[in-house]
Amino acid sequence: MIQIQLNGEARELPAGTTVAALIEQLGHAGRRIAVEVNREIVPKSRHAEHALADGDVVELVHALGGG
């Protein structure tokens, strides 16, 4: 297990969890979401391959439409 900070809250995840798996676990699959890990944007094209590590600080931001 690893410990991460997700939007400011501690969360425990299985080792090897990817950004894509986290998004799916949270019920946000298919939504427009920006992901930042340790202050760096993770492009959607890398969500499936970017494994989270112990101590990572993750921010998820939902994209909102409007005008």
Descriptions of predicted regions:
Residues 1-66:
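Ubiquitin-like/PB1-type beta-grasp interaction modules and other compact soluble beta-rich domains
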